[in-house]
Every structure is written in structure tokens, then in C-alpha cells.
């Protein structure tokens, strides 16, 4: 199973990594990152959800129709579900070798398999990549992609023939209920891992069930079932030490409706999903009350009750350092996997109070302060993203003058109504003080620009200055 790695935004936006420059002007990018002291001119429909068997699909295995007085048996679970679990592989047809493997299970009319999007992502994003299955009896076959849900890391693929008995989808069980995670990882064959439902994660941007069981590598996309045999979640991630995460089956039921409704343009569907998710995620930013803290002369917004977390990242100055700073970083745990090269949905911002430890000449201070004026950024493939476009300006924040640089990098693939999903970056540095400065850095990835500008403006509007 591919574990979705969170980008270390704290490290990327902290000084050691932020020193990485943007592409040079010689590459055609005008960043506007001049020294701070240098002044510039101001400037879906219905369908079968798979929740029950019907006349058009094979009867479910016996356990799927288990009654309350039927004794539970792991042996029966093993026998009933083994034929309905498949290994799903993405193959580079140019080499004949796999680039990823995971698990899948039969849903819908019996020709479909559910799996994780990240298991088959190479087939979406790369040429000459195809999707195949291996059954528990070692039979192999080709699969075609029907629909994806990148927000919840789900995909539905299909064969051109019936694969077997379909699973039934169920709801989230009571906290503490026993669950059984199934998969066909690597060359190990069909396995069952038992664990406990610990409920839906509360302070997270993603709907996930916390599962206390050892979801193993290659089990991504496999089902987790209750004692009645209903799929309550799809294996998606593991953090080790018997901590696993499941996507609630309700999201798969929604995707199944889309898959059954007809052909889907995958890139258009992904763009729609990203836009809809951004709108829902950022709506509370404009309505919720924000926690605030004071750093230097500024009172700044930090958390607002969602998944944002803030940390102190103040560097410890060396004895010989002429200047020092106190810094706060706030970032969300939200991430949407598109490919190994592209993960979007991140939101983070840094406040830094920079000051002279002892009085020094103004020119010397501004030289040191200018080193703080740089932007973090994601390395993007030129195949998938356009060039950076940056503008410099002078604005008032908290009643004080700031120099700003704002940069965008648009996606070439995910565009709707003329607006691309883009990465947005902003740095603002206070100017006019001789021995003290203040910087604000904001990073939003995979967002429509109009919404991103509103988010940045709302954040900056809440900042106030006061004399100590």
C-alpha cells in the first residue's frame, strides 16, 4: 500500500528550506523579490448503490445476509470473501512491469472492482500505463477505468466479464465494534486483519475511520467489513503501530452511482471535485471565529476550529548572530493525492518577527532582513503546470506599510469555466522600521485563484498592530 506522505510544510516554509529561490528571471519568471529596502512603484443522478443485491446481480455470499442469530466465524469469513478480493496493479506497457499494486473488491453488477485512486493513478497521469487484476486463483485480466474520487482516494475499474459476487456496502458501525480488513497484498495472497472501529476522525479535513489494526502494504483499496459482512470502509492508509485509516463506504456508494451513470471525462471530473472540495473546505474560514495570538507588535489569526494546527518554529540564535526572530507556522492536515509528482490542497502560513539583537546601522539591518524575503514553493512538472507569474505591490496590513510579492502557477489539466486550479504564494514584509521587521508568508496549493485571493485577503484583514 502506498502511504500518502504529508508534505513537510513546516520545514518547507521555515528558513532553512525557504531559502530555495524561485526560478530565476532568466527562465522568464519575474518574481519581484527585490531587496526589501528597494522601493518600486506602488502598484449525480440515481443508480444502484450496491447496498443490496437485486435481480440483475448475483446473490451475495452467505455472510452478507447474516442474521443476528448466525454465529460469527472467521473461517466462514475467509471462505466467503476470498474469491471476491483481487490484486489490482498498474503496469507500464512499455516495460511490462508494475508501477503500483493494491487490492480491490467486487461491487455493483459484478464486473466492477473498487480500489484506491492512488493505486491506479499512474494510468490516469502517464502514457502507456494500464490496469490489470490478479484473482486469488492467479487468473489475470485487463481492467478499464470508470470513475475516480481523488478527494476520498477512491476509484472504480471494470472488467469486460463478470468477476464474481459483489459486496454489500454498509454504514459506519458503533465505536468499539470489531472489524475485519481484507486484502490481497503482493504475493502473499488473501489475508484478514482484525481490529477495532475507533470512530470518524474529528479534527481532520478528510472523512476517515480510525481503525486499530495492522493494515499491511498492498492492502490499499481492500474492504473492511463488520461481522455481518458489510463493507463499512475502504483501506487507504497506515501509520504503523496498528493505526490504520479507512474511507467510509458511503463515499464509494456515491462514486458507484457516477460509474453506473455512463462515461466520465476523468480530468473534468477531477477539476469538479477539487473545486467543490475547496469551496466546502474554505467556507468556514469566512464565518468561524479565529483564535489569535500576539507576536512582536502584531496580533494575528491562527486557528479557527478546523484542522489548522499552529506551532512555534522560532530559531535559536547563535551567540554571534546580530539579529533574531520569533516565528509561528500554521498548517492544515489536508492533502489530495493526484500523482507522485502532484499533491494539492495544502494550506499554510508563517508569521515571523525579525529584530536586531543590538543596535546596528540601518543598511546592515536591511541586508539581514532582506534575506528573510523569499517564498516556499512546490516543485511542479512543466508537463502539468504552467509558468510562475509574480507581481510586486505595496499594501497596508494592520495600518503599517508592507511590500508584497504574489505568485501563481496554474494547472494545465484541471480547468473549469476558464479558471485553472492553481498554486498561490504570498510574502509580505513590513517596511520603514530601522531595527525591526515582520514577515507573513502564505501558501495555498490546488485552489481556484479567485477563492485563494479571498482566503489570503481575509487572513490579512484580521491582523492588527499595537505598540508594546
Where are the regions a protein language model picked out?
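Catalytic-histidine neighborhood of serine endopeptidases
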Residues: 101, 108-151
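Flexible, gly/ser-rich surface segments that form the specificity/activation loops bordering the active-site cleft
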Residues: 119-124, 165-208, 216, 236-245, ...
Amino acid at each position: 500500500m502506498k502511504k500518502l506522505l504529508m508534505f513537510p510544510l513546516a520545514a518547507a516554509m521555515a528558513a532553512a528550506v525557504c531559502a530555495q529561490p524561485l526560478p530565476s528571471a532568466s527562465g522568464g519568471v519575474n518574481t519581484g523579490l527585490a531587496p526589501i529596502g528597494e522601493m518600486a512603484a506602488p502598484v449525480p443522478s440515481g443508480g444502484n448503490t450496491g447496498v443490496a443485491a437485486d435481480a440483475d446481480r448475483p446473490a451475495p455470499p452467505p455472510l452478507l445476509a447474516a442474521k443476528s442469530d448466525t454465529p460469527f466465524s472467521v473461517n466462514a469469513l475467509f471462505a466467503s470473501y476470498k474469491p471476491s478480493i483481487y490484486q489490482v496493479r498498474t503496469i507500464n506497457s512499455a516495460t511490462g512491469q508494475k508501477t503500483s499494486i493494491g487490492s480491490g473488491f467486487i461491487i455493483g453488477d459484478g464486473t466492477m472492482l473498487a480500489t484506491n485512486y492512488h493505486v491506479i493513478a499512474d494510468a490516469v497521469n502517464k502514457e502507456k500505463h494500464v490496469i490489470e487484476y490478479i484473482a486469488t486463483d492467479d487468473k489475470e485480466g485487463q481492467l478499464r477505468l470508470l470513475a475516480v474520487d481523488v478527494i476520498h482516494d477512491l476509484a472504480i475499474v471494470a472488467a469486460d466479464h463478470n468477476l464474481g459476487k459483489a459486496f454489500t456496502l454498509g454504514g459506519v458501525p458503533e465505536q468499539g465494534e470489531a472489524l475485519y480488513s481484507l486484502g490481497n497484498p503482493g504475493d502473499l495472497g488473501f489475508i484478514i486483519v482484525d481490529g477495532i472501529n475507533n470512530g470518524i476522525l474529528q479534527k481532520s479535513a478528510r472523512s476517515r475511520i480510525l481503525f486499530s489494526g495492522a493494515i499491511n502494504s498492498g492492502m490499499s483499496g481492500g474492504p473492511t467489513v463488520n461481522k455481518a459482512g458489510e463493507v463499512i470502509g475502504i483501506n487507504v492508509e497506515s501509520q504503523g503501530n496498528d493505526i490504520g485509516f479507512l474511507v467510509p463506504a458511503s463515499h464509494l456508494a456515491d462514486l458507484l452511482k457516477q460509474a453506473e451513470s455512463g462515461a466520465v471525462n476523468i480530468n473534468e471530473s477531477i477539476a469538479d471535485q477539487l473545486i467543490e472540495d475547496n469551496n466546502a473546505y474554505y467556507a468556514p474560514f469566512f464565518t468561524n471565529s479565529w483564535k489569535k495570538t500576539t507576536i512582536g507588535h502584531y496580533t494575528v489569526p491562527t486557528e479557527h476550529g478546523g484542522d489548522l494546527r499552529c506551532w512555534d518554529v522560532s530559531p535559536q540564535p547563535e551567540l554571534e548572530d546580530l539579529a533574531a526572530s520569533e516565528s509561528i507556522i500554521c498548517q492544515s492536515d489536508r492533502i489530495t493525492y493526484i500523482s507522485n509528482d502532484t499533491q494539492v490542497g495544502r494550506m499554510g502560513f508563517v508569521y515571523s518577527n525579525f529584530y536586531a539583537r543590538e543596535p546596528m546601522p540601518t543598511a546592515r539591518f536591511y541586508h539581514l532582513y532582506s534575506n528573510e524575503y523569499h517564498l516556499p514553493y512546490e516543485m511542479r512538472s512543466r508537463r502539468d503546470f504552467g509558468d510562475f507569474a509574480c507581481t510586486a505591490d505595496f499594501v497596508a496590513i494592520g495600518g503599517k506599510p508592507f511590500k508584497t510579492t504574489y505568485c501563481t502557477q496554474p494547472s494545465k489539466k484541471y480547468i473549469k469555466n476558464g479558471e485553472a486550479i492553481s498554486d498561490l504564494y504570498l510574502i509580505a514584509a513590513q517596511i520603514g522600521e530601522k531595527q525591526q521587521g515582520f514577515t507573513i508568508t502564505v501558501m495555498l496549493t490546488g485552489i481556484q485563484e479567485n477563492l485563494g485571493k479571498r482566503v489570503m485577503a481575509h487572513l490579512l484583514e484580521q491582523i492588527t498592530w499595537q505598540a508594546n
